[in-house]
Amino acid sequence: MAPNPLRAVLKTFLALLLTVCTALVVVSAGTPAQAAGSKYPTLGIPPAGANDWACETTRRRPHPAVIVHGTFGDQKSLLDPLSLSLKRDGFCVFSLDYGNRATGPIQDSARELKRFVNRVLGATDAGKVQIVGHSQGGMMPRYYIKNLGGAGKVEDLVGLAPSNHGTESTGSFSTKSFCPACAQQAAGSDFLTALNNPDETPGTVDYTQVVTKYDEVVTPYTSGFLTPGPRSTNITLQDYCPVNLAEHVTIPMDRLAIAWTLNAFRRHGPANADAPLGCI
């Protein structure tokens, strides 16, 4: 019997929801010190097609692809379709778990990303990587690019519903004790103010931001945009497919979002906003 994609999506969503709920229970049941010391386990399983450390790049696909998960996520959840699509297109694909399910300080997570990118480059003998990240995973690499030497090691950064300017949906509870990264992703936070000034798109990296009007986590959804220009393109899925129903959780599995990722990775420069991509 063929697998039911809707069932798979719901199963993954419920798993993530359980993770978030568990974190909230920790906050409500424990002291701030206890919450701050909590560890959120992962299985350490990469998405399908990823982390083949013997993979060799090609002239057609010279840059390894690195997938970066979002807050409360892990390298496996939600990311199989994206990883498989990149692998089938000829990329060497890699992914990592980081930051205690991406709840720790974003600066520390960026340092983990730096070490991982260096490992990927060493294993593949490539000069640069191409990064695609979901939610915080689309924003956090910008800290690596701006402050940790990543500008010379990243060819492309594609953000899928990235939290580039934070979110107004931070909730009424305090998140600093159990999720410093959540507090840092609040709209107007000191972290984001420093990250976005004076230049949102530093270096020679090509930036592509793919967002959905139905994002219920990064709000407003336009918070994911960066300043447009020759090296920066903003894509709203519903502008190309009005009936596209992707939202924050499902966007990394969405076929149109994946198509835009491939569009960006296959060409020099960011994604081509005039590409004839529509409902898939």
Identify the role of each PLM range.
Residues 68-69, 93-96, 107-201:
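Serine-dependent carboxylesterase/thioesterase catalytic core
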Residues 203-280:
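C-terminal catalytic-base region of ester-bond hydrolases, centering on the histidine
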Residues 70-73, 98-104, 178-182, 245-251:
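Second-shell loop/turn segments in exported
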Residues 84, 88, 146-147, 263:
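Short, well-ordered alpha-helices that flank and scaffold nucleotide-derived cofactor binding pockets
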Residues 65, 93-95, 157, 207-209, ...:
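Conserved beta-strand scaffold positions in the cores of enzyme catalytic domains, especially
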